[in-house]
A protein has these predicted regions:
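Alpha-helical support elements that line or immediately flank enzyme active sites
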Residues: 2-12, 203-204, 255
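Intrinsically disordered, low-complexity serine/threonine-rich segments
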Residues: 347-348, 352-354, 359-378, 385-386, ...
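Non-membrane alpha-helical segments in proteins
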Residues: 1-8, 18-21, 80-84
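Aromatic-lined substrate-binding rim segments of carbohydrate-active enzymes
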Residues: 14-28, 63
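Extended ligand-binding clefts on enzyme/binding-domain cores
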Residues: 27-63, 70-76, 92-249, 256-258, ...
Length: 400
């Protein structure tokens, strides 16, 4: 998000430094060479060797430990890296950032889901060589992916990315609940059962990221105002224990994009009240702000935002101030509209059709698609078999 905010502020060179670091991390993982990114990296100068991951020395066990979430790969985080690279690409004469985004997209595409209303699952959790697969689906993640795949399709002219965007957008649309005028947070591990948690970003982001959503789902703003507003700003969820600076910035940006400038400026004033001494912004106005979620690494503990300077909060504050939409890399709402939706199974088929390494599976897909026959049971069996095949080995510097 910081890279996109820098682009929005006209700081192309600084944004490119972050983009270059992202590309370097893709190519210099200690284990993976398949186009993925980790959820976190150690801060500092990028020099040589493998990308350094955050961790700590445990004196009791006398060894180096790493957080299982941080070493994993959430598809939503990868989508934001795609958006960052594509925002830099928009002001760059080189295609390397666009190519990097395509590499990330290729990795994410394998998580297209056939259950329920499709979309993409969460990614991976834990250490190599066999991290756990996240089978839940997130409204937020799929919103990010719809925007990222859509931008990539526009920049490259490759229709398969448009198909991916359509699949992600379709999932987000089906998470809308007219009864509460809100988006569900996503699904449980079964990929079907809705997660009832009400999260601010799941209400705001679709309206900024999906064409026509700001009008179609405008009542989500009213729901957020009625159920998540606090101290003239917004909280993460319904607890309303304090202001969530990042989310307040997101709502301010949405209102600015909708032409509701007065309301947006009022929220920017609330954000300014959360300035930290280092000229950054605190994540929240309270010591610990609940999200409604529990920690993946310790399900007995709640996931909180703490009153500490937060780069995400500063980045969204900048985006709100500049009126720059990170989902479009412009100062406007999305204008493109995906083509006629394909089923999740068809989208999965289109992706693997391009991978010649899949051999027989590829030919089976060709027969089904060219004949116009799409027996769902057969397609589900094919998709399951395709996931078990070993992915192609690539040189880390090779662009898919």
């Amino acid at each position: 998000v910081a890279a996109i905010a820098l682009v929005g502020c006209g700081e192309r060179d600084k944004a490119s430094r972050i983009g270059t670091a992202i590309l370097w991390a893709i190519d210099n993982d200690r284990t993976w060479h398949d186009g993925r990114l980790r959820n976190a990296y150690a801060a500092g100068v990028v020099a040589s060797g493998f990308a350094k991951l955050p961790g700590w020395w445990d004196n009791t066990q006398n060894k180096w430990l790493e957080d299982r979430y941080q070493v994993g790969s959430d598809n939503g985080n990868v989508a934001w890296a795609m958006l960052a690279l594509l925002s830099i690409d928009d002001v760059s004469a080189s295609s390397r950032f666009r190519d990097g985004a395509a590499r990330l997209a290729t990795w994410v595409a394998q998580w297209a889901d056939t259950r329920g209303t499709g979309g993409f699952t969460g990614g991976t959790f834990g250490h190599e060589p066999t991290p756990d697969v996240r089978t839940w689906k997130s409204t937020e993640h799929n919103t990010d992916l719809a925007a990222a795949f859509g931008l990539l399709a526009t920049r490259t002219g490759d229709s398969r990315w448009r198909d991916m965007a359509t699949a992600a957008e379709h999932f987000v649309n089906t998470m809308w609940d007219p009864a509460c005028a809100c988006f569900a947070a996503g699904t449980a591990e079964d990929g079907v059962t809705r997660n009832p948690i009400l999260a601010l970003d799941a209400q705001v982001w679709p309206l900024m990221a999906l064409a026509g959503a700001a009008k179609k789902f405008a009542s989500a703003i009213t729901t957020a105002e009625q159920r998540m507003s606090v101290d003239k700003g917004f909280s993460y969820g319904e607890d309303r224990d304090g202001v969530w600076t990042e989310g307040t910035g997101q709502m301010a940006l949405l209102l600015e994009l909708l032409g509701r400038t007065g309301e947006a400026k009022s929220l920017v004033a609330v954000i300014e009240s959360q300035r930290s001494p280092d000229a950054g912004f605190y994540a929240t106005s309270v010591r610990g702000l609940p999200t409604g979620f529990m920690l993946d690494t310790d399900p007995a503990k709640p996931r909180l935002y703490f009153r500490l300077p937060h780069l995400g909060a500063a980045s969204w504050a900048a985006l709100a101030e500049r009126g720059f939409n990170p989902f479009t890399a412009t100062k406007g709402l999305p204008q493109w509209r995906p083509s006629q939706p394909f089923s999740p199974i068809q989208v999965k088929c289109f992706f693997d059709f391009d991978r010649s390494e899949f051999g027989q599976s590829r030919r089976f897909c060709r027969r089904r698609m060219t004949s116009g026959l799409h027996p769902k049971a057969d397609m589900i069996k094919w998709a399951a078999a395709a996931r078990k095949e070993k992915p192609p080995t690539r040189n880390p510097t090779e662009t898919p």
